[in-house]
Amino acid sequence: MGVKGYTALIAAVTAERLVELVVSKRNLEWSKAYGGKEFGAGHYPAMVALHTGLLAGAALEARKRRFRPGLGWPMLGLVVAAQTLRWWCIKTLGPQWNTRVVVVPGATRVASGPYRVVPHPNYVAVVVEGVALPLVGGAWITSLVFSVVNAVLLRIRIRVENDALQSLT
């Protein structure tokens, strides 16, 4: 995969992320209509900045690297797997899925789909994508920096989400 192919991949993932934001906005409106309460809004801008940095950093760093098929193709497989898992989460949660942490009073905690196996499967997708997407293009610095900062933010995010989910019981 050359620079053009990798740039197309980053553009496709960026487009997918924009679709996610549209779905999230629609779901946020649904949640608010049913009395949804947002938790942990303070860390949301940092998450947006981090994910924007992932896409920009991977695209820029990959221009200085060369594609290594032994690494790049398996990482592309992981990117596809992560996207598949993410959309399985979105479909399973339906209107309760959001890029923000929002709980609707009276809603029940979803325990089907990937949530049967892992309490926070969307974050598994985020971690895998954050490692793999940059490595498709050999952008190991972006992969490393994203992974470290993401680990810090996920500690905060998962704590906030768990506290929010406790309010359902």
Question: Model-derived features: where do they sit?
Answer:
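Long, highly hydrophobic alpha-helical transmembrane signal-anchor segments
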Residues: H43-L71
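Alpha-helical architecture
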Residues: A15-L18, A49, V80, V117-V118
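N-terminal signal-anchor/start-transfer transmembrane helix
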Residues: A12-S24
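Cytosolic-biased juxtamembrane loops and peripheral soluble domains of multi-pass membrane proteins
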Residues: S24-G42, R66-T169
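Short, composition-biased local secondary-structure segments
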Residues: M1-G2, V131
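Hydrophobic transmembrane alpha-helical segments in integral membrane proteins
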Residues: V3-T14
